Amino acid sequence: MTIRALSVSLIAIPLVVAAADPSGKAVLKNAEGKEVGTATFTPTKGGVKVQVQVANLPPGKHGIHIHAVAKCEPPEFKSAGGHFNPAAKKHGFHNPEGAHAGDLPNLTVGENGKAKATATMKGATLGEGDGSLFGPDGTALVVHADPDDEKTDPAGNSGARIACGVIEKK
């Protein structure tokens, strides 16, 4: 191998490593500290794919959001802060000035207490930058008691926080 070829190879290595953003996972727990679900986070073109799976939650629609602090102190989970909103937008998919990067579609839980959902967070990343879920304060996924109306700022009238999980690198 020539010195020139070796130099090109060494320059390309950081580019390949930088292109591979990490993935993430959150274990969701209720106010009693019992595990009620998981969420996975994978990089995708233009954002982050979120897959949520829950059990033992009340039936019905529940607002789910990414919150701006990686803390889930029960019973109210207020330690998770407000919604993840690096672009300083208003709340909700139906708000002309929205949505927060942390806004996700409602989660519909069946009569059996279970639900699965997949969504893409546009403008978020698992790499570095303002939209990173792994920024200085980290982030958490929060499940709310009520449905999100997808327009009322700051949280869509989605009620109390009933489950929370810190998003960690996988």
Enumerate the predicted regions with their spans:
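Bacterial N-terminal signal peptides
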Residues: A5-P14
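N-terminal secretory signal peptides that target proteins for export/translocation
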Residues: M1-T2
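N-terminal leader/targeting pre-sequences
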Residues: A18-K170
